């Protein structure tokens, strides 16, 4: 009897372990499949339909019950008639593509320190380049306080692809485009910004804590071995030298020069030495300094189109 009970308990343990492993495996497969699908999917929303819906809701909210009935009836009749006209037109013009109505593609970029949204931005831009017709435009609603230069450098390069294909790019800044964020914004053919948005901060910053004295105080040795004179300049735990600090600052200044040259190449009318001090300004002052082209929100820009 004990043998049967022990065997049943052993079998139950094996079954539980197998079920647990299978569950974990299925979760991993499901997540991987979801990521794979997500990588190649773009959500496309018609802003025309959205604003039309909002407008109709506001109109209806101001009407009496009788007025709503009349409006709904006439609106249904209009849609039905328009649908018939469109179907007749398409039947007669099977291969016709409407080239006369330019499209405004609206993209969003909400940047973090690593500019991780560049992954989706590159796919969106590739899709637009493949589909865009003559006179189509792109609006990028940008919000970023900057971050690592290689991340924002790549994001700026992605936006440059639109300019190279002669697709007009407008960047709108409703809140902030500073440092790496402005590196992206300056690529645009036209920059608009809200009055109190934060613009500029064309500079480079780096700060590193050093715990070497604390380690020495507690009798902790720290060894750092490198191959190459400047493989490591400033460190967190090692002892930093004067030469290392000078090299670090030299690299920092060189990066700033590259940043300035890039911004100036995109906006030649800027007094680059005046605006590249690392300062930031509100939208109204940024307009005076030619960092932007117009005071306007993204909402006004979209509705005007």
Curated annotation (Swiss-Prot):
It is an enzyme of class 3 (hydrolase). CDD domains: S49_Sppa_N_C (cd07023). It holds the Pfam family Peptidase_S49. The keyword Membrane applies. Its EC number is 3.4.21.-. The chain crosses the membrane at residues 9-29, 185-205. The keyword Cytoplasm does not apply. Keywords: Cell membrane, Hydrolase, Membrane, Protease, Serine protease, Transmembrane, Transmembrane helix. Signal peptide: none annotated. It comes from the Bacteria. GO terms for cellular component: plasma membrane. One of its GO terms (biological process) is proteolysis. It is found in: Cell membrane. GO terms for molecular function: serine-type endopeptidase activity. It is a multi-pass membrane protein. The active site is at 179 (nucleophile), 231 (proton donor/acceptor). InterPro entries: ClpP/crotonase-like_dom_sf, Peptidase_S49, Peptidase_S49_N_proteobac, S49_SppA_C. Belongs to the peptidase S49 family. This is Probable protease SohB. It comes from Buchnera aphidicola subsp. Schlechtendalia chinensis.
């Amino acid at each position: 009897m004990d043998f049967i009970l022990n065997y049943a308990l052993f079998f139950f343990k094996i079954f539980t372990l197998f079920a647990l492993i299978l569950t974990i495996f299925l979760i991993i497969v499901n997540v991987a499949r979801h990521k794979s699908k997500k990588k190649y999917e773009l959500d496309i929303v018609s802003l025309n339909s959205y604003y039309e819906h909002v407008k109709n809701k506001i109109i209806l909210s101001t009407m009496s019950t009788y007025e709503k009935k009349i409006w709904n009836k006439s609106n249904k009749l209009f849609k039905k008639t328009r649908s018939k006209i469109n179907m007749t037109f398409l039947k007669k013009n099977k291969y016709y593509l409407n080239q006369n109505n330019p499209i405004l593609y609206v993209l969003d970029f909400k940047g973090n320190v690593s500019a991780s949204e560049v992954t989706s931005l590159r796919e969106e831009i590739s899709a637009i380049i493949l589909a865009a017709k003559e006179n189509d435009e792109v609006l990028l609603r940008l919000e970023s306080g900057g971050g690592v230069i290689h991340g924002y450098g790549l994001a700026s390069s992605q936006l440059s692809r639109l300019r190279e294909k002669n697709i007009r790019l407008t960047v709108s800044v409703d809140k902030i485009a500073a440092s790496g964020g402005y590196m992206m914004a300056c690529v645009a053919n036209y920059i608009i910004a809200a009055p109190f948005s934060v613009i500029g901060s064309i500079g480079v910053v780096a700060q590193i804590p050093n715990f070497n004295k604390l380690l020495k105080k507690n009798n902790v040795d720290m060894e750092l071995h490198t191959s190459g004179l400047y493989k490591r300049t400033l460190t967190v735990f090692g002892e930093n030298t004067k030469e290392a600090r000078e090299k670090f600052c030299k690299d920092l200044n060189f990066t700033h020069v590259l940043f300035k040259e890039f911004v100036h190449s995109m906006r030649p009318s800027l007094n680059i030495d005046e605006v590249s001090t690392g300062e930031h300004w509100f939208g109204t002052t940024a307009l005076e300094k030619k960092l932007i082209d117009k005071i306007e929100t993204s909402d006004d820009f979209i509705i005007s189109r």
